C-alpha cells in the first residue's frame, strides 16, 4: 500500500509518455476506467486504513515536500490533498539543506510516532536537482 500510493501520487502529476509507461508498469491500465477512478480508489482505501474505530492500528501518511522556488500546479497539489491526504510543504532544499532535512525527518517521526527517525538526508551535491520529495510512512 505504501509504495503504491506514493507512486500513484507521482503518476497523478505525470503526462504523455511518462504517464502511459507508469500506467503500464503499475498495472493501472489493467484496472480500467479513467485515471480519476484510480485516485478515488486510493482515496477510499486510505480513509478505510486510517479509521480510528478498529481493533487494529494501521496508519498511513503521505507528505509532499517541494522546493520553494518551484511552482507546482495548483491542480496537482489540490489533488494530492483530496485523494492522498498530502499537502505540500515548501522547503528550501537548495540553500538550507539542514533545515529541510530536519523538517522532513520531523514530519516522518511525528507520523510514525517516533518509529522512523532520520530517514532522509539531503546531500549538498544533489540539492540543486531536488524539485520535490514525496514521503510515505505506515505504522
From Swiss-Prot:
- State the Gene Ontology terms under molecular function: serine-type endopeptidase inhibitor activity
Compartment list? Secreted
Disulfide bond residue pairs: none
Looking at the record's lineage, which domain of life comes first? Eukaryota
Which residues, renumbered to this chain, are glycosylated?
A: 50
Q: Name one GO biological process term.
A: activation of immune response
- Expression sites by tissue: Highly expressed in dendritic cells and primary leukemia cells, especially those of myeloid lineage.
Give the UniProt keywords, A-Z.
Glycoprotein, Protease inhibitor, Secreted, Serine protease inhibitor, Signal
Cellular-component GO terms for this entry: extracellular space
Query: Residues of the signal sequence?
Result: 1-20
PANTHER family documented for this protein: SERINE PROTEASE INHIBITOR, SERPIN, SERPIN B6
Provide the function of this protein: Putative serine protease inhibitor.
Similarity comment: family membership: Belongs to the serpin family.
> This chain belongs to which protein, by name?
Serpin-like protein HMSD
Amino acid at each position: 500500500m505504501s509504495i503504491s500510493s506514493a507512486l500513484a501520487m507521482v503518476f497523478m502529476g505525470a503526462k504523455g509518455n511518462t504517464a502511459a509507461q507508469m500506467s503500464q508498469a503499475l498495472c493501472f491500465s489493467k484496472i480500467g476506467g479513467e485515471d480519476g477512478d484510480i485516485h478515488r480508489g486510493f482515496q477510499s482505501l486510505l480513509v478505510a486504513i486510517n479509521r480510528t474505530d478498529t481493533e487494529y492500528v494501521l496508519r498511513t501518511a503521505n507528505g509532499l515536500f517541494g522546493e520553494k522556488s518551484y511552482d507546482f500546479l495548483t491542480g496537482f497539489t489540490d489533488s494530492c490533498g483530496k485523494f492522498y491526504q498530502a499537502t505540500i510543504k515548501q522547503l528550501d532544499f537548495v540553500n538550507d539543506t539542514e533545515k529541510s532535512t530536519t523538517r522532513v525527518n520531523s514530519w516522518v517521526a511525528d507520523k510514525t510516532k517516533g518509529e522512523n527517525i532520520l530517514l532522509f538526508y539531503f546531500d549538498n551535491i544533489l540539492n540543486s536537482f531536488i524539485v520535490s520529495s514525496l514521503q510515505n510512512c505506515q505504522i
